[in-house]
């Protein structure tokens, strides 16, 4: 084995270790349940089985009045897209899998999603270059 091949192998191992290191201590998410929209939610470390941070905003219409509430939590699955059939409830749910990514329900493409796609693309190019 020549030194170039050994260097490439070490770089590959380092890249894999860096990509895996972030999950060693568990995902961190904000957590609160049914609180007013303006309320701050504390950060928690999720259980190892929880792979998603959930952000849910709910608007309740009761007696011509609107109440806006939010829930932030860790879950093992993404409930986005599950319809609520009550016409007096409007709900928006988003799921993400980066630390503290559920501060708000995104209105467009997530910055973290775009960063993840970019990182994956870049690591693929680096990997092909090394091999």
Swiss-Prot record:
The lineage of its organism: Eukaryota, Metazoa, Chordata, Craniata, Vertebrata. Gene3D superfamilies: CD59. One of its GO terms (cellular component) is cell surface. It is a lipid-anchor; GPI-anchor. Pfam families: UPAR_LY6. A lipid is attached at residue 109 (GPI-anchor amidated glycine). Its main location: membrane. Residues 110-131 form a propeptide. Residues 27-116 form the UPAR/Ly6 domain. Disulfide bonds join 29-53, 32-41, 46-74, 78-95, 96-101. It comes from Mus musculus. Keywords: Cell membrane, Disulfide bond, Glycoprotein, GPI-anchor, Lipoprotein, Membrane, Signal. InterPro entries: CD59_antigen_CS, LY6_UPA_recep-like, LY6H/LY6L_nAChR_modulators, Snake_toxin-like_sf. The keyword Disulfide bond applies. It is found in: Cell membrane. Residues 1-26 form the signal peptide. This is Lymphocyte antigen 6C2. It comes from the Eukaryota.
């Amino acid at each position: 084995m020549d030194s170039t091949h050994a260097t490439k192998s070490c770089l590959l191992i380092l890249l894999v270790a860096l990509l895996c290191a972030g999950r060693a201590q568990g995902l961190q998410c904000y957590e609160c349940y049914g609180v007013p929209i303006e309320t701050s939610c504390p950060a928690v470390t999720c259980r190892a089985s929880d792979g998603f941070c959930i952000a849910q905003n709910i608007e309740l219409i009761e007696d011509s009045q609107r109440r806006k509430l939010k829930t932030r939590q860790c879950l093992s699955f993404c409930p986005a897209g599950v319809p609520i059939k009550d016409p007096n409830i409007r709900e928006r749910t988003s799921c993400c899998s980066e630390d503290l990514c559920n501060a708000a329900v995104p209105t467009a493409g997530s910055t973290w999603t775009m960063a993840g796609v970019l990182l994956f693309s870049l690591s693929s190019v680096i990997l092909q270059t090394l091999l």
